[in-house]
Amino acid sequence: MAESRSDKRYDDQNDEERSSQSTTPVNNPNKSGDNPAPAKHRPVGPKTKTLVRSEAYVNGKLSRPAFISLTILTFITFVGNFTQLQLSSALPAIVDEFHISVTIGQWLTSVFQLVMGVMVPLTAFMTRRFSTRQIVITSMLVFTAGSALSWLAPNFVLVLAGRLLEAIGTGVMWPVLQITVFSIYPLDRRGMAMGTVGLAMSVAPAIGPTLGGLQTDLSGWRSMFLTLTIIGVVSVIAAVVGLRNFGENDPNAQADFFSVVLSIFGFGGLMFGFTNIQSFPLIHPMTGLPMLIGVLGIIWFVMRQVRRQRAREAGTGTKEPLLNLHVLANRGFTVGTCTASIAFFAFSSILVVMPLYIQNDRGYSATMSGLIMLPGALGMAIAQFFGGKMLDRFGARPVAILGSSVLTIGTFGMSLISATSWIWWVSICQFVRQIGMGFVLMPITTWSLNCLEEDEVSAGSAVTNTARQIAGAMGAPVLVILMETFTAMRHAALGGGAETAALANIFGIQWVLRVSGLLCLLMVVIVVIGVRGQGAGTAHAIGRGALRKIRSLSK
């Protein structure tokens, strides 16, 4: 039933868009019986007024207010992604200045990921309760305060507190940007829009650590937070001046604060435990206890949301759930969310494992490691853009099959590394992998959200981003532990000793890559079997398009 409603809505909305683009404006001065003048970009009232789709997307193009607003949101979200990764290059300098251990210093990056993971489930309520301007301006004020605090902090605790505020400020921005794109663009143009946004987002991991290291070397780590403070102030001013509201909100909506608490302890506890699993044993109080609390909290959270939703649908209750999990009843959305989560789980570990191979086992510098991995990040940015355009033209199914297959081939190819491999083979395989990731991740996410009703997109965005955050947080530590297990077994088989340590470690990395490849292969199967229905498309469409292109060139 969910798919049939989505199919009908897909056609109805396209008709609505065509109708809205040919309708005479309300204040059209043309009083005669002649054909009305084409719709033009027209004033849409004060900045606090909600910009509806007929005003934001006119004659197949963004109106000026919508373009400015989307640019501001994309820039702010980019800053959030950039901030998350920028500090990794400055950790040695911070550790030296405050005389702390590397493990403690790592919390500057861990707490950012942890807080962002906690914030994402709350975005569904926030977008329901507050307007776009209220959310964005408040978030950037919090971000700016956090950046200033870290810049001026006399001790590590205040630097960490500033990072926490930065994460709170930026944690909601990606879901807000997704929801805004879906409220502006019609169904058959969302792939291109999300691909363009994904292009901007993918640049952040490519340049974040590099620019962070360069700025730290030139002017010290505090200059990074000074720069972010200035960017925060500029972003607040830009949002106040140029940002419009999108989508409807209910100022009277009430939050279920007990669900908020369950969400924080559930998702936060689970991610906290997995973050520590590389530093402590599984049964240690810093890992096992938070993970147990997290699992119990998530189970309680899910049961409470389902119970409230059922009571509301049955007319026996009026209180809304904090997060509408009914979206998981939609087959297309669930398939897309599972696919994206598997991709994050399998992909995140490689970003941890391969630098170990390049630096520890092959003896290359950290700078060289970054250069080897850099082409892949740029490839993913380009692939997300073209993947979005292909989604609009051919549908999600052929694009996702292509992407997941390329990702699988690249992963198994990378598993062929050895102690004497050409080092740029890693770069080539990572480039292939991230090309595949770009072609599968954004199209499958866009398609899965397209399967939902308009009023379910905010909940769907929160659910899918939460699942991806958890999968990413779990993937790296789980596969690193698997690598260490294979390494220990191989080291013992080789008789132990320092001279065989590197060979044993490479053996462990090879098997982790093979396991990751099997997960990618599972993703191919899920896409082939599960991605169906309106908007999914077929491989025949690509074939017909290619044949038409060949015939036109031969004439």
Question: Where is each model-derived feature located?
Answer:
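Intrinsic disorder in cytosolic terminal tails and internal cytosolic loops
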Residues: 1-65, 530-555
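Transmembrane-helix bundle of Major Facilitator Superfamily
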Residues: 2-3, 31-241, 394, 406, ...
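Peri-membrane helix termini and adjoining interfacial loops of integral membrane proteins
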Residues: 45-50, 314-315, 488-498
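12-transmembrane solute porter fold
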Residues: 66-82, 87-91, 99-124, 131-136, ...
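Hydrophobic alpha-helical interface/terminus motif in multipass membrane transporters
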Residues: 91-94, 180-181, 215, 243, ...
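Cytoplasmic-side transmembrane-helix entry/capping segments in multi-pass membrane proteins
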Residues: 190-200, 252-261, 287, 397-400
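Hydrophobic transmembrane-helix bundles of small-molecule transporters
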Residues: 217-338, 364, 372, 512, ...
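Short, membrane-exposed interhelical loops at transmembrane-helix boundaries
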Residues: 494-508
